[in-house]
Amino acid sequence: MGRYELHYGGDRRNNAPAMRRDYNGGLIAFSRYFSFFSSRTCSPESSINNQFRLLCITCDTLTTTHNFSQLLRQCIDERSISGIKTIQAHMLKSGFPAEISGSKLVDASLKCGDIDYARQVFDGMSERHIVTWNSLIAYLIKHRRSKEAVEMYRLMITNNVLPDEYTLSSVFKAFSDLSLEKEAQRSHGLAVILGLEVSNVFVGSALVDMYVKFGKTREAKLVLDRVEEKDVVLITALIVGYSQKGEDTEAVKAFQSMLVEKVQPNEYTYASVLISCGNLKDIGNGKLIHGLMVKSGFESALASQTSLLTMYLRCSLVDDSLRVFKCIEYPNQVSWTSLISGLVQNGREEMALIEFRKMMRDSIKPNSFTLSSALRGCSNLAMFEEGRQIHGIVTKYGFDRDKYAGSGLIDLYGKCGCSDMARLVFDTLSEVDVISLNTMIYSYAQNGFGREALDLFERMINLGLQPNDVTVLSVLLACNNSRLVEEGCELFDSFRKDKIMLTNDHYACMVDLLGRAGRLEEAEMLTTEVINPDLVLWRTLLSACKVHRKVEMAERITRKILEIEPGDEGTLILMSNLYASTGKWNRVIEMKSKMKDMKLKKNPAMSWVEINKETHTFMAGDLFSHPNSEQILENLEELIKKSKDLGYVEDKSCVFQDMEETAKERSLHQHSEKLAIAFAVWRNVGGSIRILKNLRVCVDCHSWIKIVSRVMKREIICRDSKRFHHFRDGSCSCGDYW
């Protein structure tokens, strides 16, 4: 056999070795020559392909397995498929054993990322080793081509090639990716026959993971119980499955069993079981697991820290969660999102928005869930301007068509009284689902656009989407706020006929609809259909009695409420106000004395207004705590004078205390929404004035704000505890029905 001997008498410009024919060697000189050109500062195509082609033309044969492997490794390092193809051509020319060359070429092609060429080589092989089958199946699954992986597995079985532990541990993942449950069960049976289910931990772990993804935690647990040697991966897979399926008690039990069996948890075990503790609000076990995590050295692991943070937030221990967050050296997107969403869920919206701003300053890119949480924080506080800025961030990062960020925007604009802007966002969503439809329907409902809400509900039905309990509540609320009594009754009857599970909240909404329409007997009759009427249901009916001044019925309902919750302050306050509105001052004194004895306090009426991204708070009767109180009172007096010129007269029935008439007038002038509006007008805020109130707007303030909107020629949007009121040109969107 001929050989090319290297000497340095060749190209002096680049110091390349020359070759001459020698008959004593093999591929050593060839390999040295190949390595020399591979090390030059030239492109991979030049170093591998061109030089290799030159050698292949001049060489007679290449026969050493070691040298072929060396050349293929060089191609893998350079990720050169063209080099592999050249080697394959020369292997065929040299008569290299096909069963060896094929396997090596498939392996090299896969490592270079060309699965299709690897498959082409594989299909041309007459004999295929199990290792080659496994490699190709594993790479297909890794590159999300599970369907092809399963087809290859079927071909393997057809060719009477028995799978081994590596085949099965790979293909079980493909089955779960494609939801091929029946085929997965057949292959599980094959694993049992081959003795791999019990004896091999890789197969056992893959089976547990597969059944978990099918949502079959019972089957996953049976597999785990049969595996002889259990490890952390196996048990963690089951705990993750329990946690994801909401079987949190079982997740905690599995973790406890793990400790009994002396299997050391890893950071992912801790992360999963802590989420379950949070879902259960099981702070006892949560703190115990936190202690174990510290003892095991996993306290600084990011996955464990994030789950610990989430657990404390779900248990409403905000201070503990903040301490955990401060210990995270480099918080990532997931950590920030967990903190922000948890703070919003715990009613710490202002803090959540502060943390969101810190996240943006740290240049951590938010995801759609982060943005959705920040937007809900703005919507809960009616922070319109702040929300609009976050809308800009949503657009910047390309989430304006995302359903989660989109729903957050719809919720924001809906709760800031801008249903038209909410609808614009809704119409741009790339995917309409039940969540986005519910959010838009609720936006219409709370802003008094009942017909639009019902049209959207009809669209939902036509799209074939199944309404859920939120949909039903939003639709009934739309009818309630728009005085669509008959439509609401028809819908409620249809929901009952369709056997939709109706909750106490749905019944409370219908009781409110009928009660406000003056159909109190029907409303009371409806309560008899509820198996366990709760306080909300009875209070709703009691509120209707107050509106229509039905004292006798109210007293009867009050007795029922106090049987459920003795000393319920909301009920006593409602009854006190009802007695006051009907002139029964002796009963008012009696109720207030009872409240005093029970040390009950009425929640103060409060209003908020956002000015230049800063929220200002006003409390009824508090005239001097605000730094601009002098200017506010001057402006309020001027507004009251102008409104009286246009016919405003104080409605003294809204004062539930026995006092002089002039004192009643002063009391009405000091309501929190009046103070907030006076401040906003004094600050000369452009555009609409947006007020948020924690209680219902009283009749007197409602009448006054209507006139002020006409005086100032400004829209005033007031969101109270019940709904939105859009005041324009002396009228309100509610039609004086709230």
Swiss-Prot record:
Residue segments, region Type DYW motif: 645-738
Keywords: Repeat
Residues in the signal sequence: none
GO molecular function: RNA binding; zinc ion binding
Keyword Repeat applies: yes
Type E(+) motif: annotated segments: 613-644
PANTHER family, A to Z: PENTATRICOPEPTIDE REPEAT-CONTAINING PROTEIN, TETRATRICOPEPTIDE-LIKE HELICAL DOMAIN-CONTAINING PROTEIN-RELATED
Protein name: Pentatricopeptide repeat-containing protein At5g65570
Organism, as annotated: Arabidopsis thaliana (Mouse-ear cress)
Lineage: Eukaryota, Viridiplantae, Streptophyta, Embryophyta, Tracheophyta
Encoding gene per record: PCMP-H47
